[in-house]
Amino acid sequence: MFARGLKRKCVGHEEDVEGALAGLKTVSSYSLQRQSLLDMSLVKLQLCHMLVEPNLCRSVLIANTVRQIQEEMTQDGTWRTVAPQAAERAPLDRLVSTEILCRAAWGQEGAHPAPGLGDGHTQGPVSDLCPVTSAQAPRHLQSSAWEMDGPRENRGSFHKSLDQIFETLETKNPSCMEELFSDVDSPYYDLDTVLTGMMGGARPGPCEGLEGLAPATPGPSSSCKSDLGELDHVVEILVET
């Protein structure tokens, strides 16, 4: 049976080993969590900058988070080893400085930068980012302008076709128009003369009225049908022109 003191030493040694292993695990897990948080913060910062109207409070909070992680990694000495890997993962034009991202918003709102943002943070190339945003904006404006001009062009073509139709109607000689509609007006005049003759004459009997109307009705009805057919034909010609 082991002595009491020796047993305690063995247990203490095992506990120290387990504690060291647990500490290494916690340190490695914390470094992984910190690296993942840094990556997510950089992505969110980029997305905030790409918005048309970025949220100032959100961008400042994300920038402060990136700044704190950078300070911790510089103190641990892991910033120099991780920075090239991050540069290989994402292009340089996406890792833009937090001060550059928030400078325009600070100038518009008249606010001062957060105390967590200093002058010693990393700076990304601004010249690489500006052409991208300036190239995206005109494309969006051109697409919206083309979408708005589409119905206007259709309206313009419709108005032009109407103007051409009215011009063709105005340029024609009025005598030609009278000749076209002369045949249409003739049966109405015949019907008027028949009605005026019936009203102006003596009041006939019932049999005489029927005899007088019987031979007169077939002629105007047939002529009206033919004239209406001609009128439809003329209207079709005018619509086609």
Swiss-Prot record:
<dbReference type="GO" id="GO:0005737">
    <property type="term" value="C:cytoplasm"/>
</dbReference>
<protein>
    <recommendedName>
        <fullName>Cell division cycle-associated protein 4</fullName>
    </recommendedName>
</protein>
<feature type="domain" description="SERTA">
    <location>
        <begin position="30"/>
        <end position="77"/>
    </location>
</feature>
<keyword id="KW-0539">Nucleus</keyword>
<dbReference type="GO" id="GO:0005654">
    <property type="term" value="C:nucleoplasm"/>
</dbReference>
<dbReference type="InterPro" id="IPR009263">
    <property type="entry name" value="SERTA_dom"/>
</dbReference>
<dbReference type="GO" id="GO:0005886">
    <property type="term" value="C:plasma membrane"/>
</dbReference>
<dbReference type="GO" id="GO:0005829">
    <property type="term" value="C:cytosol"/>
</dbReference>
<comment type="function">
    <text>May participate in the regulation of cell proliferation through the E2F/RB pathway. May be involved in molecular regulation of hematopoietic stem cells and progenitor cell lineage commitment and differentiation.</text>
</comment>
<dbReference type="Pfam" id="PF06031">
    <property type="entry name" value="SERTA"/>
</dbReference>
<dbReference type="InterPro" id="IPR052262">
    <property type="entry name" value="E2F-SERTA_domain_protein"/>
</dbReference>
<dbReference type="GO" id="GO:0005634">
    <property type="term" value="C:nucleus"/>
</dbReference>
<dbReference type="GO" id="GO:0003713">
    <property type="term" value="F:transcription coactivator activity"/>
</dbReference>
